[in-house]
Amino acid sequence: MNELIETSMKRHPYRLPLFALSCLFLHGCCTKAPPLDLPSEQNPEEQKAEEKWSVEFEENFSSLEVGSEPENLFILDGAYAVSQEKNDKRLTLPGSPVGDFGLLFGPRVREKSLSLSFSFLATKKGRRLPALAAGLGGVRSYRFRLNAATKQIILSRQDVEIGREVYQLESGDWCRVRFQALPGDGENTRIRLKLWKRGEEEPEKWLFDEVDPSAFAGGKCALWGYPYAGTPIHFDDLKIESKAL
């Protein structure tokens, strides 16, 4: 065998090295290369939306005395007090007198995205229906108002309407809300709102997802109750979150 190899090399001195290089080349092409740690191609807006939110304020009233007015809420008007049904404590606005009753809560959050979530329970009486509202950035900034009588939700900023959507209140059922103001590039602010029945999975789709050509100054969060039906309005699970820009 050795004689054959020696004879072959004498006759074709370059054939064996070329054969060896060909084997190495084929082996390199057929061997699976280790995966590269490449950066994600995730959409920048999706990546920003998934960034972690920080809790600024949270209250579920479970540790408060029934009949008390929570000290961490600034009541603008109305006889708001903690009430209880079975093992569930919540903040209640009485059904009488009828009027416009609001409150402020949480820290003044500025130069950040702001998210407010809460639960509410409102009940009609005959043909009379209640209304409620929530605000981001104080009483004069972004607000949505649910008018059960007209089956509409109106989104506004400083009393100027931004948009409206059809929405039918399910009387007697707890509802969850998520309301967000997301400052963008320049003076734009993205406003998002969704509502769903408490106990059900949060929907992915937003009822409102609008870009307002105004800068978001930030501030406190607010709630309002309008007991036009003469029945109590209940609020629970208040939570404010913020996210750095």
Question: What do these predicted regions represent?
Answer:
Residues 202-234:
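Flexible glycan-contacting loops in extracellular carbohydrate-active proteins
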Residues 61, 118, 173-184, 191-195:
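Short tryptophan-centered beta-strand motifs in secreted/extracellular beta-sheet-rich domains
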Residues 27-28:
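C-terminal motif of bacterial Sec signal peptides marking the signal peptidase cleavage site
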